[in-house]
Amino acid sequence: MNKKEVRLRRARKTRAKIAELKSVRLTVFRTNSHIYAQVIDGSGSRVLAAASTVEADVRSQLPNGGNKQAAQVVGKLIAERAKAAGVEAVAFDRAGFQYHGRVKALAEAAREGGLKF
């Protein structure tokens, strides 16, 4: 198994538990250049809010989309958009990524923005 398959295997366990609870989830995906966050409803079929470093308004604020500063900006933005969509509490789905670095920075910024998890 390669690195990606191992990560997805870890993610499957978390997603199964979140799906069982039917809770709204905040999912994170990261690449070397960008970080993405989505708030997905309990059924897993609708995206309620999304934010990423690919967006023009976010990209204009940052020189680089692949660092902790960018993750903090995306975390605050996803919290604002989720609250605007009426979401207060979420389950954090780190998609098998370690809770460290950019993933941790995004999560902490989302908490500061008012999301509860």
Curated annotation (Swiss-Prot):
GO CC aspect terms: cytosolic large ribosomal subunit
PANTHER family recorded: 39S RIBOSOMAL PROTEIN L18, MITOCHONDRIAL, LARGE RIBOSOMAL SUBUNIT PROTEIN UL18M
The keyword Phosphoprotein is assigned to this record: no
Family annotation (Pfam families): Ribosomal_L18p (PF00861)
Gene: rplR
Xref: CDD domains: Ribosomal_L18_L5e
HAMAP family named in the record: Ribosomal_uL18_B (MF_01337_B)
InterPro entries in the cross-refs: Ribosomal_uL18_bac-type, Ribosomal_uL18_bac/euk
Oligomeric and partner information: Part of the 50S ribosomal subunit; part of the 5S rRNA/L5/L18/L25 subcomplex. Contacts the 5S and 23S rRNAs.
Molecular functions per Gene Ontology: 5S rRNA binding; structural constituent of ribosome
Keywords assigned by UniProt, alphabetized: Ribonucleoprotein, Ribosomal protein, RNA-binding, rRNA-binding
Top-rank taxon, per record: Bacteria
Protein name: Large ribosomal subunit protein uL18
Tagged with keyword Ribonucleoprotein: yes
Swiss-Prot/TrEMBL GO biological process terms: translation
